[in-house]
Amino acid sequence: MRFWLLLITALFLAGCSSHRAPAPNARLSDSIAVIAGLNDQLQTWHGTPYRYGGMSRSGVDCSGFVLMTMRDKFDLQLPRDTRTQSKIGTEIAKDDLLPGDLVFFKTGSGESGLHVGIYDTNNQFIHASTSRGVMRSSLDNVYWRKNFWQARRI
């Protein structure tokens, strides 16, 4: 009898501790509007070359592109650098990604070894690539899959 009581209690407590990703910021809660905003930003910036520290159409880095996209399209203020951006919001599982979530990669060592983009849809994200400038990439790409570090919901 005691065994069954313990088993039922354990199952009940396990059910109470289910993992749920946090809800997105109210400005990012309408996935259709977020996708439209991201597509508009990508269309405007597509092909803009990568430039470390850049924040203009003549050159932009990954954290600058993320900062400007969130500010200009969703009225959200983010820190300027990738390391600090990687600490805001709540870490979420890759399987829980929604449009507007930030995706982070460890592509090298030190501060310059971090990369950030914004999850779009269908396992795609937009970002400023060091080799190809502002573009859309797939999280299924071997390079991005291998270097994926974390995802955050703001």
Where are the language model's segments positioned?
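Glycine- and charge-enriched low-complexity intrinsically disordered segments
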Residues: 142-154
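Extracytoplasmic/periplasm-facing segments of secreted or lipoprotein envelope proteins
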Residues: 38, 42-60
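Bacterial Sec signal peptide processing site at the extreme N-terminus
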Residues: 10-34
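Second-shell loop/turn segments in exported
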Residues: 25-29, 49-57, 106
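Positively charged n-region of N-terminal signal peptides that target proteins for export
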Residues: 1-4
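Sec/Tat-exported extracytoplasmic proteins
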Residues: 42-50, 69-78, 107, 129, ...
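...with weaker cross-activation on analogous glycine-rich loops/strands in unrelated enzymes
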Residues: 26-28, 76-135
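Active-site nucleophilic cysteine motif
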Residues: 57-70
